[in-house]
Design a protein with these regions (language model features):
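Mobile "lid/hinge" segments at catalytic clefts and subdomain interfaces of large enzymes
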Residues: 42-102
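Conserved active-site and cofactor/substrate-binding residues in soluble primary-metabolism enzymes
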Residues: 6, 10, 83-90, 107
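Short secondary-structure junctions and interdomain/linker hinges
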Residues: 22, 99-106, 120-123, 132, ...
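Alpha-helix initiation and N-capping motif
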Residues: 12, 92, 106-109, 118, ...
Length: 147
């Protein structure tokens, strides 16, 4: 798409080889190249919305990462953090690994995220990724008023 901030097809192909996702083939990962949600990133187990993101003081092309969706519970995902495009594979591995470590038997990723709260789950991911992960959504930038 000409509006894409990131190249979602490239990201999707890279993630197709992710070992953590291969171990958990029932997980649904939806990748949108921008916030317009053509791939409906809010309803994937892991949703990725292409965006300019700030991570560790650097602004770059990357993804706002959604988690917590569970269609059985009528829940959509929320932004749990931000990651640069080059660290996307590591972030998905950390998300899945965190879920594997924290989940109860048979518990979906969405239910695990909600049980820990999105903020608490994000802190677990940050512990794994250190300065390659920024918790929460991209901070809003106040508009500049010109007189």
């Amino acid at each position: 798409c000409a509006l894409g901030i990131t190249e979602s097809p490239v990201a999707g192909r890279r993630l197709a080889g992710n070992a953590a996702l291969r171990r958990n083939s029932s997980l649904r990962v939806f990748v949108s190249g921008c916030p317009n949600s053509c791939a409906q990133h809010q309803i994937g187990d892991i949703g990725l919305a292409g965006s300019r993101v700030r991570v560790n003081g650097r602004t770059t092309d990357g993804y706002q990462v959604y988690a917590g969706a569970d269609l059985d519970d009528h829940e959509i995902g929320v932004v749990v953090g931000r990651v640069a495009a080059e660290d996307l594979d590591a972030a998905v591995t950390a998300i899945v690994g965190t879920w594997e470590a924290l989940r109860h038997p048979g518990e979906s990723l969405g239910r695990t995220v909600r049980r820990f709260t999105p903020e608490g789950f994000s802190l677990q991911i940050q512990a794994a990724l250190a300065d390659r992960w920024a918790p929460g959504p991209e901070p809003a930038v106040a508009p500049v008023l010109v007189r």
